[in-house]
């Protein structure tokens, strides 16, 4: 008799995706981040659901409703901090996942990669709108500054911003719609993640060598399920260390001050995971130019498959490209640091140089390094 998991219409899908899935035998821990992102998403949806039961999306009561969650709701404080720090863990996993894709040439799976970029953008939009909800100073001014960037779009900009605001400034209408979008987007992300997996399973996983592994596959369960459980345990450990010992480490103290349209904070800055893009935005003295650079800093990922000039897929055997990759990582860390600094000398020039380097490495130096390596190998 055939096993029910292989015949039942619903269980068959789960079986083919997580149990009997043929997987390369040599994928490293860098391949753990997909499952970790799934865990992060489930965790965010669950904690978010419980927060939404007590939150009110009204400018008069939003801030006090968050205070009420932390003080009066049973275990409300832990749910709130798990949600806030869960977002940080989500982005750490996202950046690692994208970095893995760049290093090992996973972007040659075009559909999977492009849906991944859409997922990244959707997650960034969700996180931005979530940051507005507590209605602290940084929530209000962050929303004002970032939505105002759209006014740089010629002709329709101002009308577009007022349409998004639902008025002439960030107010009750803005907060209510941001809450609505923040609630619905994670479910759209979950659906997109399924499509992401669907396209991945059409081709099968890449592996560290970048060489087709059809001759050497092993079942996903038990080998990679146990490996994913280890990764999940480490993720939960780091998250709970953050939540229980330093819950405000990655937050901004200004967000404990209720939103006040008459008082601007000394340094308006987004959450740490947006700082690299914020630094690129600030490094260009022109508004429209800055907005374009900001958008391109993420959308440049779409170009990665077309910038791949190497005859090899992975960087595993390409030392010059490896150097370029790690210089890019260092550059992104520099941009993240600069994004959190005030706009003054020497931070301005460092930010401008790091921004130029970012685009230069991706658009010029990495393809050039690949071409040099091809010539060295006489390919």
From Swiss-Prot:
PROSITE patterns: CYTB_CTER (PS51003), CYTB_NTER (PS51002). Heme 1 (or BL or b562) is low-potential and absorbs at about 562 nm, and heme 2 (or BH or b566) is high-potential and absorbs at about 566 nm. One of its GO terms (molecular function) is ubiquinol-cytochrome-c reductase activity. Belongs to the cytochrome b family. Heme b b562 binds at residues 83, 182. Pfam families: Cytochrom_B_C, Cytochrome_B. Keywords: Electron transport, Heme, Iron, Membrane, Metal-binding, Mitochondrion, Mitochondrion inner membrane, Respiratory chain, Transmembrane, Transmembrane helix, Transport, Ubiquinone. This is Cytochrome b. Binds 2 heme b groups non-covalently. GO terms for biological process: mitochondrial electron transport, ubiquinol to cytochrome c. Heme b b566 binds at residues 97, 196. The cytochrome bc1 complex contains 11 subunits: 3 respiratory subunits (MT-CYB, CYC1 and UQCRFS1), 2 core proteins (UQCRC1 and UQCRC2) and 6 low-molecular weight proteins (UQCRH/QCR6, UQCRB/QCR7, UQCRQ/QCR8, UQCR10/QCR9, UQCR11/QCR10 and a cleavage product of UQCRFS1). This cytochrome bc1 complex then forms a dimer. It is found in: Mitochondrion inner membrane. InterPro entries: Cyt_b/b6_C (IPR005798), Cyt_b/b6_C_sf (IPR036150), Cyt_b/b6_N (IPR005797), Cytb/b6-like_sf (IPR027387), Cytochrome_b (IPR030689), Cytochrome_b_C_euk/bac (IPR048260), Cytochrome_b_N_euk/bac (IPR048259), Di-haem_cyt_TM (IPR016174). Its cofactor is heme b. A ubiquinone binds at residue 201. The chain crosses the membrane at residues 33-53, 77-98, 113-133, 178-198, 226-246, 288-308, 320-340, 347-367. Component of the ubiquinol-cytochrome c reductase complex (complex III or cytochrome b-c1 complex) that is part of the mitochondrial respiratory chain. The b-c1 complex mediates electron transfer from ubiquinol to cytochrome c. Contributes to the generation of a proton gradient across the mitochondrial membrane that is then used for ATP synthesis. It is a multi-pass membrane protein. Its main location: mitochondrion. One of its GO terms (cellular component) is mitochondrial inner membrane. It comes from Capra falconeri.
């Amino acid at each position: 008799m055939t096993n029910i998991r292989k015949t039942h219409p619903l269980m068959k899908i789960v079986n083919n995706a997580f149990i009997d899935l043929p997987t390369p035998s040599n994928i490293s821990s860098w391949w753990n981040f997909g499952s970790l992102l799934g865990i992060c998403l489930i965790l965010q949806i669950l904690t978010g659901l419980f927060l939404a039961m007590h939150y009110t999306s009204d400018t008069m009561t939003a801030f006090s409703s968050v205070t009420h969650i932390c003080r009066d709701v049973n275990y409300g404080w832990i749910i709130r901090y798990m949600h806030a720090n869960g977002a940080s863990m989500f982005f750490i996993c996202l950046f690692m996942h994208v970095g893995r894709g760049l290093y090992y040439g996973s972007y040659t799976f075009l559909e999977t990669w492009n849906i991944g970029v859409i997922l990244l953008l959707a997650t960034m939009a969700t996180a931005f709108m979530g940051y507005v909800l507590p209605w602290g100073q940084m929530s209000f001014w962050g929303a004002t500054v970032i939505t105002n960037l759209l006014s740089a779009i010629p002709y329709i900009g101002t009308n577009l911003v007022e349409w998004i605001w639902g008025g002439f400034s960030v107010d009750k209408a803005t907060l209510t719609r941001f809450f609505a979008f923040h609630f619905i987007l994670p479910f759209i992300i979950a659906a997109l993640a399924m499509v992401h997996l669907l396209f991945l399973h059409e081709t099968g996983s890449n592996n560290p060598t970048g060489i087709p592994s059809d001759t050497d596959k092993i079942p996903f369960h038990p080998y990679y399920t146990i490996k994913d459980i280890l990764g999940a345990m480490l993720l939960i450990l780091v998250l709970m260390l953050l939540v229980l010992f330093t819950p405000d480490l990655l937050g901004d103290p200004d967000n404990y001050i209720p939103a006040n349209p008459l008082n601007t904070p000394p340094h308006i800055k987004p959450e740490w995971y947006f700082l690299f893009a914020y630094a690129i935005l600030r490094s260009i003295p022109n508004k429209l130019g800055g907005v374009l650079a900001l958008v391109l800093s993420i959308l440049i990922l779409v170009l990665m498959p077309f910038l791949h000039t190497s005859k090899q897929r992975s960087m595993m055997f390409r030392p010059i490209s490896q150097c370029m990759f790690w210089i890019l990582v260092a550059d992104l860390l520099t941009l993240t640091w600069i994004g959190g600094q005030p706009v003054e000398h020497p931070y301005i020039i460092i930010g401008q140089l790091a921004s130029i380097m970012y685009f230069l490495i991706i658009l010029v130096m990495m393809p050039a390094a690949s071409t040099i390596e091809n010539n060295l190998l006489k390919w």
